[in-house]
């Protein structure tokens, strides 16, 4: 997705890291693909509250916007408002993948929210926004034929990702990889403003 580059990303990432300090963690609904070494962590700005239905099926409910982050870092809203609004975000997080050995194990995110994923009105879309990366950090996405596609996402780029397909992240570089990740409602306004 091609949107204008937002200045100040390196400063934002450094300040966010200083602000969060040891508060980086892994949400309960993400622990199964955290790996035994926990080489990645995240913070949730709009948390996903996972509940279980009568058949033990996972359901995700949108939590409250954590204004502690958005008031301190207005750039977060600037990033979101290029493509959607906080009101239409169902989940918003920043993920940090460690250097050299950082891995988010292969997984798919289907079934967490009750709405179907996709780029149609009434569905939800997963967007990755690259805050900071390096040439040796990459994203793997399985296609329907069983092949693996590798993507090197660059700072300031928005990427749509079909979260229903198996995917993984690897960081073999010397610096941490930071992405802002959000699930958003697809509305007519979003479709009208999509720049692909």
Whereabouts are the PLM-identified features?
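Non-heme Fe(II)/2-oxoglutarate
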Residues: 1-87
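A short glycine-rich, His/Asp/Glu-containing loop-to-beta-strand
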Residues: 86-110
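Short, conserved beta-strand element in jelly-roll/cupin
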Residues: 96-97, 117-137
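Short beta-strand His + acidic residue motifs that chelate non-heme Fe in jelly-roll/DSBH
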Residues: 107, 137-139, 161-173, 181
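Short, P/G- and charge-enriched loop/turn segments at secondary-structure junctions
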Residues: 109-119
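A short hydrophobic beta-strand segment most commonly corresponding to one strand
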Residues: 126-130, 158-160, 174-192
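A short beta-strand-loop-beta hairpin characteristic of the jelly-roll/cupin
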Residues: 130-154
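Short terminal or interdomain "cap/linker" segment that borders an active site or interface and mediates
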Residues: 145-169
